[in-house]
C-alpha cells in the first residue's frame, strides 16, 4: 500500500515535469508531434495509477497498473527519441528520463507483487 501512495505522488509530479519539458521543445513539426505524444503518455501514467487506487478488484487493480506501466514504457521511448534527436539539451532530458525509468521500475514491482498475491 505504501508503494501505491508513493507511485501516485511520483507519477503526478512526473506529469508536471513532462508538461514543463514539452514547452521547451522546438516550435516545429517534430517538436509539436513528439511533444503531443509525450504529454499523452507522460500524463496518462498518473491517471491510470489514480484509477487503479479505486479499482473494484485485485484484477482490475493489476490491469490499471499494467496500463500505467505501458504508458511509462512509451514515455521512456519518446524521451529517448527527443534526447537522441538533439531536440533538447542532454542534461535537461536525462533527469526526467531517469525519473521515467524509476517510475517504470516501481510500477513493474507493484504489478509483479500484486500478481503473486492474487
Language model region names:
Residues 1-118:
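Short, C-terminally biased terminal segments at protein or domain edges
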Amino acid at each position: 500500500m505504501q508503494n501505491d501512495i508513493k507511485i501516485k505522488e511520483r507519477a503526478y509530479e512526473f506529469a508536471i515535469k513532462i508538461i514543463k519539458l514539452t514547452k521547451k521543445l522546438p516550435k516545429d513539426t517534430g517538436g509539436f508531434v513528439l511533444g503531443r505524444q509525450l504529454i499523452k503518455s507522460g500524463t496518462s501514467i498518473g491517471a491510470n495509477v489514480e484509477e487503479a487506487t479505486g479499482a473494484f478488484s485485485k484484477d482490475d487493480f493489476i490491469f490499471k497498473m499494467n496500463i500505467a506501466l505501458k504508458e511509462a514504457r512509451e514515455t521512456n521511448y519518446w524521451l529517448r527519441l527527443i534526447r537522441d534527436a538533439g531536440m533538447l539539451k542532454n542534461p535537461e532530458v536525462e533527469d526526467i528520463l531517469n525519473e521515467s525509468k524509476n517510475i517504470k521500475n516501481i510500477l513493474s514491482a507493484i504489478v509483479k507483487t500484486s500478481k503473486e498475491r492474487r
